[in-house]
């Protein structure tokens, strides 16, 4: 059985299938498909634990966004661990990660973002031309236009108008946010 799971091409294919399912959202890559295409001679009761082990290793490597030194240390530890992986499997995993790291990282970054993202921001300062109160006409106002959207979809726009008091309030809040971020960065 162990020899059946040693094949580099099959393991590389398995890792690709796991990555497609876990990180790229291809739900058609199922356990049954991987088993029948890559390891048809291995009984399901032996394939499932092997699949779970490889899935766990791949998720650990990806979630830690391991660089190549960390990867080598991690895989070396896995080869020495009871019930771990063989050095041949470690070599295949290392080769796979080196060629797929960037795509997996980008996919994880996309998945971690909110649905809509800020695509653009533009602003200008104008003089107010209409108001309920004549004293406010010609007073300066900041006009901010925000562009929101998902990749591959049409944008939505939000236009905001602020008088001098509101601009000062926003700047104060942004300063508080900056101070909070700086405190957190210094603590880390």
From Swiss-Prot:
It is found in: Nucleus; Cytoplasm; Endosome membrane; Cytoplasmic vesicle. It comes from the Eukaryota. Signal peptide: none annotated. One of its GO terms (molecular function) is phosphatidylinositol-3,4-bisphosphate binding. Cu cation binds at residues 100, 109, 133. Residues 1-122 are annotated as: Sufficient for interaction with SLC12A2. Keywords: Copper, Cytoplasm, Cytoplasmic vesicle, Endosome, Membrane, Metal-binding, Nucleus, Protein transport, Transcription, Transcription regulation, Transport, Ubl conjugation, Ubl conjugation pathway. Residues 117-185 form the COMM domain. Pfam families: COMM_domain, COMMD1_N. Residues 124-188 are annotated as: Required for binding to PtdIns(4,5)P2. One of its GO terms (cellular component) is nucleus. Ubiquitinated; undergoes both 'Lys-63'- and 'Lys-48'-linked polyubiquitination. Ubiquitinated by XIAP, leading to its proteasomal degradation. GO terms for biological process: cholesterol homeostasis; copper ion homeostasis; Golgi to plasma membrane transport; intracellular copper ion homeostasis; low-density lipoprotein particle clearance; negative regulation of hypoxia-inducible factor-1alpha signaling pathway; negative regulation of NF-kappaB transcription factor activity; negative regulation of protein localization to cell surface. Belongs to the COMM domain-containing protein 1 family. Scaffold protein in the commander complex that is essential for endosomal recycling of transmembrane cargos; the commander complex is composed of the CCC subcomplex and the retriever subcomplex. Can modulate activity of cullin-RING E3 ubiquitin ligase (CRL) complexes by displacing CAND1; in vitro promotes CRL E3 activity and dissociates CAND1 from CUL1 and CUL2. Promotes ubiquitination of NF-kappa-B subunit RELA and its subsequent proteasomal degradation. Down-regulates NF-kappa-B activity. Involved in the regulation of membrane expression and ubiquitination of SLC12A2. Component of the commander complex consisting of the CCC subcomplex and the retriever subcomplex. Component of the CCC (COMMD/CCDC22/CCDC93) subcomplex consisting of COMMD1, COMMD2, COMMD3, COMMD4, COMMD5, COMMD6, COMMD7, COMMD8, COMMD9, COMMD10, CCDC22 and CCDC93; within the complex forms a heterodimer with COMMD6. Interacts with VPS35L; the interaction associates the CCC complex with the retriever complex. Identified in a complex with an E3 ubiquitin ligase complex composed of TCEB1/elongin C, CUL2, SOCS1 and RBX1; in the complex interacts directly with SOCS1 and CUL2. This is COMM domain-containing protein 1. It comes from Mus musculus. The gene is Commd1.
């Amino acid at each position: 059985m162990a020899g059946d799971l040693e094949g580099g091409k099959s393991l590389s294919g398995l890792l690709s299938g796991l990555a497609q399912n876990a990180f790229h959202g291809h739900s058609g890559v199922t356990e049954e498909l991987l088993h029948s295409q890559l390891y048809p001679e291995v009984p399901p009761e032996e394939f499932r634990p092997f699949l779970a082990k490889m899935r766990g290793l791949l998720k650990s490597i990806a979630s830690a966004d391991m660089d190549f030194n960390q990867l080598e240390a991690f895989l070396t530890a896995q080869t020495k661990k009871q019930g771990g992986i063989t050095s041949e499997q470690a070599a295949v995993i290392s080769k796979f990660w080196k060629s797929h790291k960037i795509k997996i990282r980008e996919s994880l970054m996309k998945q971690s973002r909110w649905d809509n993202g800020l695509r653009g921001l533009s602003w200008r300062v104008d003089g107010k031309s209409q108001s309920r109160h004549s004293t406010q006409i010609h007073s300066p106002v900041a006009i901010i236009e925000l562009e929101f959207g998902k990749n591959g979809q049409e944008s939505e726009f939000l236009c905001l108008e602020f008088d001098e008091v509101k601009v000062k309030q926003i700047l104060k809040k942004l300063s508080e946010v900056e101070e909070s971020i700086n405190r957190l960065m210094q603590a880390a």
